[in-house]
């Protein structure tokens, strides 16, 4: 396909984006807003942002959710801006510096919260800065400006949502149904690979792909939840299916690992059974029915615990899958499955990364302030706003450098494009609202095509062009003001990019070590006799950390295997029949404290000391288990865990 060709699937969203821009423009001028540009800019960003992220037309609910986050972020930013102005209006320089710190603080929070919700915090950071900078000439108009800004943004969001609803947004439900069927087949095929005990790299690739697909299914669940309240029952089932899918992966991989030391546990009966190939979910359904009969015939005691647990989880998965596809009322059996264990939320392992983002945003905003004050440039304030926007939005994404480059390309492209609109198109449409709407619709349509193709600079060009063309009420055409605004955007993006390059993010290795130690802590915490603690569901949180590890260290198989082994150890120890007595309970608490010290240690020496202490305690614990005559279901997983920690001691303690 050529660079200038238009794919059919991209046309509908391009029309949707053009409609959102035209609606916001018409409403803004109809209600005599002072700066309809903010409404148009908001409509464009809210509509185009999800499309750029998705690489195509976003699914139903995505634009509404982004608009909701933008409203929240704007209100938080406006309130923060008002508080800062009221408290420090007599010290303008201090007021701007506090705003720079506020932008950094919001970026820090956005780096720690869920990626879907981080947009609101990033927006809150630079909204306060925009308000403080804009009201510098007339501070007494701050409340009026804050109210107007909120009103214009809400109008833009409503217009984007109306355009989304007008052009029948895509539902993700069919994609979810197809993925549920396909995922079940892939789970069965993974178990086949693990029972065959073939090439380790093939197995690693298979379970790695399944972890990614399960994580993607969880993202689809979020989209389905945003789409409509009628999918509430399907959403509950999908949440449970996420845990079941992760359980299937864990049991399959444990089956593979068990055969490294005790291959005789998997009998020929099960090896022959899993030799039968499957292609569809219907094939898996038939095989599971036969497998349940085989287990009933051989008996639970003669069935390996991993296969027994896998079949139980696959059966529940099938039951809930049918409920998701049909979206029928939840029956008693399903309700029993859905009333599962409470999920545990794990502490973020990216605190150091978040602090780097804080300093990047704060320093870039302070650098912009110094540049503005030193040069006295009339558009220095515009450069500062772009610095805050780029750093606040770039820091929460995996590759901030590329986001900054995208903004630089976008602002450079906006200069000639904005010049065309400022000098030729808009002056010639002054007498006709219809012509003005058509001209902006054409801009939105073609940039909407480019945004869906993720063309470098397309998103930045859309926002930057709308920001510099004259869409105020009344319109005034001062070329020097236009040029200042356009150059201010470019300079701001370049300064932000410079700070991102200078303030290096070297937190990757530290994050990886913290993640691995969190896996160790989870495995140690599973050794408990506390009933409430044993019922906690750590699996989604553990696999979320594993997914982060896979993204941070692509292709690092030893790290993935170590993390997966810790997850398997956690699941096995969680179900192990540990003898109940005060001596072991007290020692469990001691080991958990030591594991927490390993995670929180700030130096390598302390970390090694606490890790060595943990290894010694595990040796003592194994001796205690022998004294209390614990069964092999307890002693064997503990012995395997201690062996793994001894083997990977340096990887878990050294920076």
From Swiss-Prot:
GO molecular function: transmembrane transporter activity
Disulfide topology: none
Pfam family, one: FUSC
Membrane topology classification: Multi-pass membrane protein
TM helices/strands, residue ranges: 13-33, 38-58, 69-89, 93-113, 121-141, 152-172, 370-390, 407-427, 431-451, 459-479, 482-502
Keyword Lipid metabolism appears in the UniProt entry: no
GO biological process, alphabetically ordered: carboxylic acid transport
GO CC annotations on file: plasma membrane
Locations listed in the record: Cell inner membrane
Keyword Membrane: yes
Keywords in alphabetical order: Cell inner membrane, Cell membrane, Membrane, Transmembrane, Transmembrane helix, Transport
Main subcellular location: membrane
Job description of the protein: Forms an efflux pump with AaeA. Could function as a metabolic relief valve, allowing to eliminate certain compounds when they accumulate to high levels in the cell.
Family indicated by similarity: Belongs to the aromatic acid exporter ArAE (TC 2.A.85) family.
HAMAP family per the UniProt record, alphabetical: AaeB
Protein name per UniProt: p-hydroxybenzoic acid efflux pump subunit AaeB
Species annotation: Shigella boydii serotype 18 (strain CDC 3083-94 / BS512)
